[in-house]
Structure formats: C-alpha cells, structure tokens
C-alpha cells in the first residue's frame, strides 16, 4: 500500500479538529487546554513535513523543528506557571486564573 500526501493531510486534519474541539469543549482544565494546543501544533508539523517530503524541499522540515522547539519551551513555561499557580491558589481551574486579571 502506498501512503501519499492525502493520508498525512487527513491524519493532520483529524488531529487539528480534535485539538480545536478539546479547547472549545473543555474550558475548565488548563492542562487539557495546553495539551490541545500541543496537539494542534503537532498537526501543523505533520503538514509541514508532509508538504516538505512531497515537494522535495527541506524548508518545511526545518520549520517543523523550529516549531517543535518553540512548543517544547511553551509547554515547559506553561507547566511551570501552573505549578506556581497551584502552590499559591490550590487550584488550576480557569475561573481562578481569570481572577488574576486585576
């Protein structure tokens, strides 16, 4: 069986849709929102790599590595903020984060 670009784009679109649904359907838990954002970024990376392989160009793969680096930094900083917030407030609910707006 030959796997062409439509298979990659279908999987990527499905992952992107699941990530968007995770953000819109679950607005209570910050960790699930962060995981949904990571799923969206991963689906975008699959698109970059698929088009890069299809067009025989390395720019998409280099950009995917850049996005992975930024996503890892975003996840580390987001989880560190959540740990500090949980230590101070005792909860990581989104409603408690909205109280911090001032």
Curated annotation (Swiss-Prot):
Can you tell me which family this protein belongs to? Belongs to the complex I subunit 4L family.
Please indicate if the UniProt record lists Ribosomal protein as a keyword: no
Q: Which GO terms describe its cellular component?
A: NADH dehydrogenase complex; plasma membrane
* The enzyme's E.C. designation: 7.1.1.-
What is this enzyme's catalytic activity, as reactions?
a quinone + NADH + 5 H(+)(in) = a quinol + NAD(+) + 4 H(+)(out)
Entry keywords, A to Z: Cell inner membrane, Cell membrane, Membrane, NAD, Quinone, Translocase, Transmembrane, Transmembrane helix, Transport, Ubiquinone
Matches recorded under InterPro entries: NADH_UbQ_OxRdtase_chain4L/K (IPR001133), NUOK/Mnh_C1-like (IPR039428)
Compartments, record wording? Cell inner membrane
Self-association and partners: NDH-1 is composed of 14 different subunits. Subunits NuoA, H, J, K, L, M, N constitute the membrane sector of the complex.
Q: What is its main location?
A: membrane
Write down what this protein is called.
NADH-quinone oxidoreductase subunit K
Q: Which PANTHER family match?
A: NADH DEHYDROGENASE SUBUNIT 4L-RELATED, NADH-UBIQUINONE OXIDOREDUCTASE SUBUNIT ND4L
Q: How does it sit in the membrane?
A: Multi-pass membrane protein
Q: Which GO terms describe its biological process?
A: ATP synthesis coupled electron transport
> What function does the entry list?
NDH-1 shuttles electrons from NADH, via FMN and iron-sulfur (Fe-S) centers, to quinones in the respiratory chain. The immediate electron acceptor for the enzyme in this species is believed to be ubiquinone. Couples the redox reaction to proton translocation (for every two electrons transferred, four hydrogen ions are translocated across the cytoplasmic membrane), and thus conserves the redox energy in a proton gradient.
